[in-house]
Amino acid sequence: MTQLHNRTAGQETNRVMTPDELEAALRAVGAERYHNLHPFHRLLHDGALTRGQVQAWALNRYHYQASIPAKDAALLSRLPTAELRREWRRRLVDHDGTEPGTGGIARWLKLAEGVGLDAAYVESREGLLPTTRFAVDAYVTFCREKPILEAIASSLTEMFSPTIIRERVSGMLANYDWVSEETLAYFKPRLTQAPRDVDFALAYVKEHARTPEQQQAVIAALRFKCDVLWSQLDALYYSYVAPGNIPPGAFVPEV
């Protein structure tokens, strides 16, 4: 496992950063902590995982995907203006869709089915790793309870997602003959949705984080979100790669 460093650009300063300096500090968080650096993702993208290990990833990731609308709805309910609510409401539509069978959650279920999982089992979330449940639920709670500025800042991992999506799609298509473009259809819309969402969230954070304390808080919020993503992969690696200690009640691959 790689070791996270405790310091990030912009982490310790008692002066107000310019908006561009703040953006640079936020991007430095991703350069150091985003989960594309995790060994599990390298194995996934390089074709080094078994079908069962990929199934474990898809199953556990579903809990994260299905919880995104919950965290967005929690934040949406606290936004003070119609303009902000309209902007944030698009995220709910992206994931929940406008009718049954549409939206990101439905596409992720198709991905899970495409790698050999039963959709009803995935939706039940019965086979989740405990760490997956704890990490994702902590993120939903963070967005429900933290100041709006910090909750919005925590979404800025999307600054880094287009790169990992391209790596994931190209790597999985090249290395797993049982994965198709249809299986990975979840990711194509995210290549346009994520940058659109970032444009709003980053502009909001740069405008409203005006004091040293606020700026450090938004950097910490992004670090927290990176930790949420990283910890999920730690659990997958420990349970399904090495040492392979699957917790009681969690999904056990057949292959």
Curated annotation (Swiss-Prot):
One of its GO terms (biological process) is sulfur compound metabolic process. It is an enzyme of class 1 (oxidoreductase). It catalyses: 6-(2-amino-2-carboxyethyl)-7,8-dioxo-1,2,3,4,7,8-hexahydroquinoline-2,4-dicarboxylate + 3 O2 = pyrroloquinoline quinone + 2 H2O2 + 2 H2O + H(+). SUPFAM superfamilies: Heme oxygenase-like (SSF48613). Ring cyclization and eight-electron oxidation of 3a-(2-amino-2-carboxyethyl)-4,5-dioxo-4,5,6,7,8,9-hexahydroquinoline-7,9-dicarboxylic-acid to PQQ. Belongs to the PqqC family. This is Pyrroloquinoline-quinone synthase. It comes from the Bacteria. Its EC number is 1.3.3.11. HAMAP family: PQQ_syn_PqqC. The keyword rRNA-binding does not apply. GO terms for molecular function: pyrroloquinoline-quinone synthase activity. Pathway: Cofactor biosynthesis; pyrroloquinoline quinone biosynthesis. Keywords: Oxidoreductase, PQQ biosynthesis. InterPro entries: Haem_Oase-like_multi-hlx (IPR016084), PqqC (IPR011845), PqqC-like (IPR039068), Thiaminase-2/PQQC (IPR004305).
